[in-house]
UniProtKB/Swiss-Prot annotation:
Protein name from the UniProt record: Small ribosomal subunit protein uS10
UniProt lineage: Bacteria, Pseudomonadati, Pseudomonadota, Alphaproteobacteria, Rhodospirillales
Annotated S-S bridges: none
InterPro entries: Ribosomal_uS10, Ribosomal_uS10_dom, Ribosomal_uS10_dom_sf
Function as written in the Swiss-Prot or TrEMBL entry: Involved in the binding of tRNA to the ribosomes.
Gene3D superfamilies reported in the protein's UniProt record: Ribosomal protein S10 domain
Gene Ontology BP terms: translation
Family according to the record: Belongs to the universal ribosomal protein uS10 family.
Top-level taxon of origin: Bacteria
Coiled coil: none
Keyword Ribosomal protein: yes
Record note on quaternary structure: Part of the 30S ribosomal subunit.
One Pfam family in the UniProt entry: Ribosomal_S10
Gene field: rpsJ
C-alpha cells in the first residue's frame, strides 16, 4: 500500500509570521504522531515597482518599492486521522496563505 502524503505550501509577506505558523503546524503534526519533512524554504519572490517622485518634471528622480513573498514547504508523511483533524482545527496567523495537496 502506498503511503499518503499531505503537502502544505505556505506564503506570506512577513517571514516571522510565516515561521511561527510553520512551527505551529510542525508541532501539531508531531504531537499527533505523524512524520514531518521540512520546513523547506522556497525561493522568495521579489516584485519591484518604480515610480516618479515628482508628479510633474524630474524624470530622473525615481523611487523604488518592493514586495517580498516568502514561501515554505512542508510534507506530512503517513498522517493519522487525528493529525488531519488537528490541522483542520488549527488557527493560523492572519496574512499566511495555505495551500494543501493530498
Amino acid at each position: 500500500m502506498e503511503s499518503q502524503n499531505i503537502r502544505i505550501r505556505l506564503k506570506a509577506f512577513d517571514h516571522r509570521v510565516l515561521d511561527q505558523s510553520t512551527r505551529e503546524i510542525v508541532n501539531t503534526a508531531k504531537r499527533t504522531g505523524a512524520q514531518v519533512r521540512g520546513p523547506i524554504p522556497l525561493p522568495s519572490r521579489i516584485e519591484k515597482f518604480t515610480v516618479n517622485r515628482s508628479p510633474h518634471i524630474d524624470k530622473k528622480s525615481r523611487e523604488q518599492f518592493e514586495i517580498r513573498t516568502h514561501k515554505r514547504l512542508l510534507d506530512i508523511v503517513d498522517p493519522t486521522p487525528q493529525t488531519v483533524d488537528a490541522l483542520m482545527k488549527l488557527d493560523l496567523a492572519a496574512g499566511v496563505d495555505v495551500e494543501i495537496k493530498l
